[in-house]
Amino acid sequence: MILLVDAGNTNIVLGVHNGERYIASWRISSEGNKTSDEYGIQVMQLFNLSDIDPKNITGVIVSSVVPNIMHSLENMLRKCFCHEPIIVGPGVKTGINIKYDNPREVGADRIVNAVAAYEIYKRPVIIIDFGTATTFCAVRANGDYLGGCICPGIRISADALFERAAKLPRVELEVPKNMICKNTVSSMQSGIIFGYIGQVEYIVKKMKQEMKNSKYKEEPFVLATGGLANLIAKETDVIDKVDSDLTLEGLKILYEKNKEIEISQR
């Protein structure tokens, strides 16, 4: 039984896989001022509520884009599970070829998603991860990670509008019935959601053109993941599939490729 941990800027997602299926997954806040004990209390309560014995965990892997929580998070995992966690980063075997100018700049979340897409789908793919930031990544059928782009996430865009425009309220991220709206809240939702859909469609169009017109001439499959993927996917035809478990699947694959690291550290 392995514990998979994906630490993002807003939430930490934890999943437990028993070798055949996920038996539990949870989401907790990734507030930067928590101690290892505070994280431990939260995580142990979740294990208890799901009737899972922490002693049955045989390995742990972590992907993080939040450096300031890693000290507390790693200490908690060592204390609670008595395993040295594998940290996704330099030195970890991925099975993909990162074509970035500086491969160390690529976020762990993007690497994990790329590994999952390559291993599961075995075809050229554009991965859109709707998180705190929205990332677009291009991966060839042979596992070459070509790069991509990074945009402010939908919630960041909505929060910026609320924070910088004095008379505009904070709004729920819901799709309005019409593009032309007759009240402030719906008008903001229209601009935020439909504007974001337009951004996604244009970026996907340009990325497809570059992948098709390059020497590779590949037609990519468009895969979406992240908390708001379903919201956007329902409103556009450029997304071929939503895979909500893509990041956890990538972590599971990376654990299998690197579990000898954890064994050697015992």
UniProtKB/Swiss-Prot annotation:
Question: Quick one: which residues bind substrate?
Answer: 100, 107-110, 184
Q: Which residues bind ATP?
A: 6-13, 132
Can you tell me which residues bind K(+)?
A: 129
Residues at the active site: 109
Q: Which keywords has UniProt assigned to this entry?
A: ATP-binding, Coenzyme A biosynthesis, Cytoplasm, Kinase, Metal-binding, Nucleotide-binding, Potassium, Transferase
Q: How is the cofactor bound?
A: A monovalent cation. Ammonium or potassium.
Q: Extract the InterPro entries matched here.
A: ATPase_NBD, Type_III_PanK
- Say which domain of life the source belongs to: Bacteria
* Similarity comment: family membership: Belongs to the type III pantothenate kinase family.
What the protein does comes down to:
Catalyzes the phosphorylation of pantothenate (Pan), the first step in CoA biosynthesis.
Q: What protein name applies here?
A: Type III pantothenate kinase
